Amino acid sequence: MSSYFVNSLFSKYKTGESLRPNYYDCGFAQDLGGRPTVVYGPSSGGSFQHPSQIQEFYHGPSSLSTAPYQQNPCAVACHGDPGNFYGYDPLQRQSLFGAQDPDLVQYADCKLAAASGLGEEAEGSEQSPSPTQLFPWMRPQAAAGRRRGRQTYSRYQTLELEKEFLFNPYLTRKRRIEVSHALGLTERQVKIWFQNRRMKWKKENNKDKFPSSKCEQEELEKQKLERAPEAADEGDAQKGDKK
């Protein structure tokens, strides 16, 4: 209430008239901390204790303005005990907030938002799992016993290899490199072809050993040609007997 209203209210009544002096007396039952008792009424000489002093008892020094002003004494409710001035014990109020987490008290909305965000992320991860990255070592490896595809040679490559085989059934490393480069093959492919060709020659001539020199090979070819007419005559004789 403004000071003008208070002054006009008190000017209508004199000391001791119609209103008892005890009506405005309000004192604390206990004097805690050696603080003076707050008394309102005509006996106090028109002065009373500033509310900032009462606030200092609970919250320490006040940063509010301490300019003197007058206040209606009826606006202040006195219950006898300064500890119950606000209706509850300040010590209990402090212990109530001290028992909780200060972060939850100050940032309750943030905590709840963060918790809800984490819950949504967990649900999203369960519904749509992220694709796993496949590393080279995680891919299925080829079977150890798997055979490679059979190499096919063109007519030109086969003709050139046959010529080289008739000239020399065994190739040196240098000659093998030259043949492989000329035919567009690898050294391993040329080597395997010559091995297979020698095995084929042994089966055709019924020999356990392939001739190591060219002279031996020529002699074997001559013997084969000599045996050819004899084999033809024997075949004709067998056909005549059957008839």
Curated annotation (Swiss-Prot):
Instruction: Give the residue ranges for region: Disordered.
Output: 203-243
InterPro entries per the UniProt record, alphabetical: Antp_homeobox_TF, HD, HD_metazoa, Homeobox_Antennapedia_CS, Homeobox_CS, Homeodomain-like_sf, HTH_motif
Q: Does the keyword Nucleotide-binding apply?
A: no
Biological process GO terms, please? adult locomotory behavior; anterior/posterior pattern specification; dorsal spinal cord development; embryonic skeletal system morphogenesis; grooming behavior; negative regulation of myeloid cell differentiation; regulation of transcription by RNA polymerase II; sensory perception of pain
The primary location reported for this protein is: nucleus
Extract one GO molecular function annotation from the record: DNA-binding transcription factor activity, RNA polymerase II-specific
Keyword annotations for this protein?
Developmental protein, DNA-binding, Homeobox, Nucleus, Transcription, Transcription regulation
A cellular-component GO term for this protein: nucleoplasm
Positions of the DNA-binding region: 146-205
Q: Where is this motif: Antp-type hexapeptide?
A: 134-139
Question: In which compartments does the protein localize?
Answer: Nucleus
Q: What role does it play?
A: Sequence-specific transcription factor which is part of a developmental regulatory system that provides cells with specific positional identities on the anterior-posterior axis.
Task: Give the quaternary structure.
Answer: Forms a DNA-binding heterodimer with transcription factor PBX1.
- Which family, according to the similarity comment? Belongs to the Antp homeobox family.
What name does this protein carry? Homeobox protein Hox-B8
* Gene (UniProt): HOXB8
